Amino acid sequence: MSVSYNGGLTGLTALVRNNLVHYQQWSDVEVVPLRDREALRGRPAQKLSNDDEEIGVEYVLPVELSQYRSSGVTLEALDKVFSQLPASCKRVVLAISSDDGTVVYYTVYQGLQRPRKN
């Protein structure tokens, strides 16, 4: 989706940004330009994991469902994304959008993540 609106953002980035701000109630959401795509960063309304001590800045990678299905989201592609983000970023939230505008979120961690203790 390369339609441009909402201040020059691509349609996908604008869709995910609006979903984060208006439905998920994130604050301070802004675009992070990467080499070959756009990401977003912002503060969620609540912690994304029980392991988090406090609410911090999270990075979101908008992805179309067709990219996800066609293996456009590979470990290599995610490594490239992590290499362009601050070293303190240990996870990225994938925002997968379908053709009807529905957005679902999945968390992807950099490297291996130990299972949490109950």
Curated annotation (Swiss-Prot):
This protein's GO CC annotations: tRNA-intron endonuclease complex
Q: Which InterPro entries match?
A: Sen15_fungi, tRNA-endonuc_su_Sen15, tRNA_endonuc-like_dom_sf, tRNA_intron_Endo_cat-like_sf
Q: Name one GO biological process term.
A: tRNA-type intron splice site recognition and cleavage
Disulfide linkage? none
Extent of the signal sequence: none
**Annotated GO MF terms:** nucleic acid binding; tRNA-intron endonuclease activity
Question: Coiled coil: which residue ranges?
Answer: none
The entry's keywords: tRNA processing
Record text on subunit structure and interactions: tRNA splicing endonuclease is a heterotetramer composed of SEN2, SEN15, SEN34 and SEN54. Interacts directly with SEN34.
The job of this chain, per UniProt, is described as: Non-catalytic subunit of the tRNA-splicing endonuclease complex, a complex responsible for identification and cleavage of the splice sites in pre-tRNA. It cleaves pre-tRNA at the 5' and 3' splice sites to release the intron. The products are an intron and two tRNA half-molecules bearing 2',3' cyclic phosphate and 5'-OH termini. There are no conserved sequences at the splice sites, but the intron is invariably located at the same site in the gene, placing the splice sites an invariant distance from the constant structural features of the tRNA body.
| Record's protein name | tRNA-splicing endonuclease subunit SEN15
Source organism = Eremothecium gossypii (strain ATCC 10895 / CBS 109.51 / FGSC 9923 / NRRL Y-1056) (Yeast)
